[in-house]
């Protein structure tokens, strides 16, 4: 990418990919307990897709996830992928992922930190587009 961000070694990539799998599973199933395993308690959720800032704490975000019908419960096929993973340092990573839920196609910029021997999302900043179909 550049000389500031680097590619993770295979072991680190695997650890981050496993954390992202929990993230994808949690969103697809609307499972807040899974999401709580991958989000740091002080994490921030933010977007400006609709023209104003939406910024939530996990205490605000998790009840929203819990209250909405999950993609799995609606019979949706799972549509998620990892676009890139880069390190800013040994305990700081940026993962760019894509996923779709209903008519929304999301690009998530997930800043991750390694604390307590595991990778955790400390910020989720995202954009979404609506499917034309």
PLM segments and residue spans:
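Beta-strand-connecting loop/turn residues
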Residues: 41, 90-91, 117-118
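Short beta-strand edge/turn micro-motifs at domain boundaries
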Residues: 94, 105-133
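Surface-exposed, charged secondary-structure patches
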Residues: 15, 24, 44-105
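Short beta-strand segments enriched in hydrophobic/aromatic residues
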Residues: 39-40, 99, 125-126
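Short, low-complexity N-terminal intrinsically disordered segments enriched in polar/charged residues
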Residues: 1-33, 37-41, 59-60, 131-133
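Residue-level detector of alpha-helical recognition elements and their boundaries
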Residues: 31, 38, 49-51, 76, ...
């Amino acid at each position: 990418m550049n000389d500031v961000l680097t590619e993770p070694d295979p072991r680190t990539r695997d650890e981050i990919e496993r954390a992202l799998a929990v993230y994808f599973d949690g969103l697809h199933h609307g499972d807040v307990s899974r999401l709580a395993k991958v989000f740091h308690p002080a994490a921030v959720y933010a977007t400006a897709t609709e023209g104003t800032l939406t910024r939530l704490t996990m205490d605000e975000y998790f009840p929203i996830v819990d209250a909405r019908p999950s993609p799995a419960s609606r019979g949706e096929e799972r549509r998620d992928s990892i676009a890139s993973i880069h390190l800013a340092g040994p305990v700081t990573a940026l993962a760019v992922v894509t996923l779709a839920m209903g008519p929304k196609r999301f690009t998530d910029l997930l800043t991750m930190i390694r604390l307590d021997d595991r990778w955790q999302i400390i910020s989720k900043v995202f954009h979404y587009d609506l499917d034309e179909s």
